[in-house]
Amino acid sequence: MYSTTILLVQPETSSGVYLRTRLETKGYTVVEAPDTTTAMNIVNGSEIALVVTELYLRTGKSRCLARTIGQSPALRRTKVLAYTKHGKREDRAWARRIGADGYVITRSGEDRFLEVVDDLMETPSTPRRGRSSDATTE
């Protein structure tokens, strides 16, 4: 069965509550994690289709969360969306190198965020990593 569960990784904020509400309204199940340790515990123990995270959010050994997920054989079908304030060309290149499947700059707005989430959730998951979807925006 195809999972419709999205893990939203960010500290509790009003924008996080708003994004969760918008995602749930669209029919997605949303799980939240306030930090990377909690996020990795959830991802390792649940069927998560998509992880939404800040591009440079670090895990315990100072490794990028997106890269950690992308390099795990058990999680290589889990998609990662970098939802970030960083919009430089080198940030996008970094996201592609570490295996982010999509990239949205926060100032693009929630509607664009939801479009990219829908695109990623509709695209069949493949076990390949180190790629980035065309679902990117400024």
Cite the ranges covered by each PLM segment.
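Conserved phosphotransfer microenvironments
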Residues: E54-I69
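Two-component/phosphorelay signaling modules centered on CheY-like receiver
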Residues: T13-V31
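Acidic, metal-coordinating helix/loop segments flanking the phosphotransfer/catalytic sites
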Residues: E32-L50
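Alpha4 helix (beta4-alpha4-beta5 surface) of REC/receiver domains from two-component response regulators
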Residues: C64, H86-V104, R112-E115
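CheY-like receiver
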Residues: P124-E138
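His-Asp phosphorelay/catalytic-motif detector in bacterial-type signaling
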Residues: S3, E47-A49, A74-K79
